[in-house]
């Protein structure tokens, strides 16, 4: 979202949204996904936030295990480790996250109906199976990273 304002190959960003802007966008996305959940009665649509949710939740769990103050600043998110410790460029890290979330979402939208028609389970059942498999794979990848 902020890429159109912040990405300037040879200069500084024209606009910096920071946490406040990110939270505003998050509320809009949560409203849209919440509306979809209410319309369908299927909570598995939260998968559209899975990559970012896994990183956020597991980072909090990691910090709790380390007895860190959750109110203090940190650099423990995977994207921060990739950019700061591994020196991978921010554009590459952001692109990786976006493409990973896109792949999870596209798989959810297109693969579940195919599995429903081939294997006979309901679409909602495949949504739950897909959600748990994706959650497990992302969690293992996070822990191994």
Where are these regions (language model features)?
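Alpha-helical transmembrane segments
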Residues: 1-145
């Amino acid at each position: 979202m902020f890429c159109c304002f912040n990405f300037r190959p040879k200069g500084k960003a024209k606009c910096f949204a920071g946490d406040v802007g990110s939270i505003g966008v998050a509320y809009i996305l949560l409203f849209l996904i919440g509306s979809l959940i209410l319309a369908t009665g299927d909570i598995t649509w939260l998968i559209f936030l899975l990559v970012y949710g896994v990183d956020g939740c597991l980072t909090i769990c990691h910090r709790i295990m380390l007895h860190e103050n959750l109110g203090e600043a940190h650099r423990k998110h995977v994207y921060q480790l990739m950019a700061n410790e591994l020196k991978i460029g921010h554009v590459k890290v952001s692109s990786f996250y976006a493409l990973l979330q896109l792949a999870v979402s596209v798989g959810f939208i297109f693969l579940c109906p195919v599995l429903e028609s081939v294997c006979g389970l309901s679409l909602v059942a495949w949504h739950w199976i897909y959600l748990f498999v994706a959650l497990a794979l992302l969690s293992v990848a996070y822990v191994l990273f």
